[in-house]
Each structure stands twice: as C-alpha cells, then as structure tokens.
C-alpha cells in the first residue's frame, strides 16, 4: 500500500513538472524522468537479464563443440529441443 502511495506521489510530481513550458523546466523534467520514471514502472525481476543457456524452444545457432542450450537440450532446426534419446 505504501509503495502505491509513493509511486502515485512521484507520478503527480512528475506531471506537475511536465505541464510547464519553460526551457529550465524541460531540463529538470528530463533529469527527473531519468530518475523516477524507471522506478515507477515495475518490471518482473530478471526479465532483462540474459540467460546463460537457452531454454526449450529458444532460438539458437548450432556451433560444433558448443551447446548454447541448457542441460538436457540440444540445438536442432534453429531451436533448443529435447536431446535425442531422452
């Protein structure tokens, strides 16, 4: 509940700053946008993190002696698929 109130207050403050048309205010708005807007929009944790290996049906490029797919999977037909014989 407290998090919602903080996000609402920051968003309201951001709207007040963006409503004015002065050049100095535009500079302040750009700074605040970089600081607060990213925090107000929540994304699932780790969404943008790159995985070390491909999961089932991820795209992959086959390179001999390297397996870009996670354990138990292999790169076939440009996708990470279950290993043959499993």
Swiss-Prot record:
What keywords would UniProt list here? Answer: Amidation, Cleavage on pair of basic residues, Disulfide bond, Knottin, Secreted, Signal, Toxin
The task this protein performs is described as: Possesses strong antiplasmodial activity against the intra-erythrocyte stage of P.falciparum in vitro. IC(50) for inhibiting P.falciparum growth is 1.59 uM. Interacts with infected and healthy erythrocytes. Does not lyse erythrocytes, is not cytotoxic to nucleated mammalian cells, and does not inhibit neuromuscular function. Has neither antibacterial nor antifungal activity.
Where found in the cell? Secreted
* Name recorded for this polypeptide: U1-theraphotoxin-Pc1a
GO function terms (MF aspect): toxin activity
Which is a Gene Ontology cellular component entry for this protein? Answer: extracellular region
Q: Which tissues show it?
A: Expressed by the venom gland.
């Amino acid at each position: 509940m407290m998090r919602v109130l903080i996000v609402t207050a920051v968003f309201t403050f951001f709207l007040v700053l963006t409503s004015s048309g002065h050049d100095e205010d535009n500079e302040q708005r750009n700074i605040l946008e970089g600081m607060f807007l990213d925090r107000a929009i929540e994304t699932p944790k780790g969404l943008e993190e790159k995985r070390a290996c491909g999961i089932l049906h991820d795209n992959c490029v086959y390179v001999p002696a390297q397996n870009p797919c996670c354990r138990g999977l292999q790169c076939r037909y440009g996708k990470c698929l279950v290993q043959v014989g499993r």
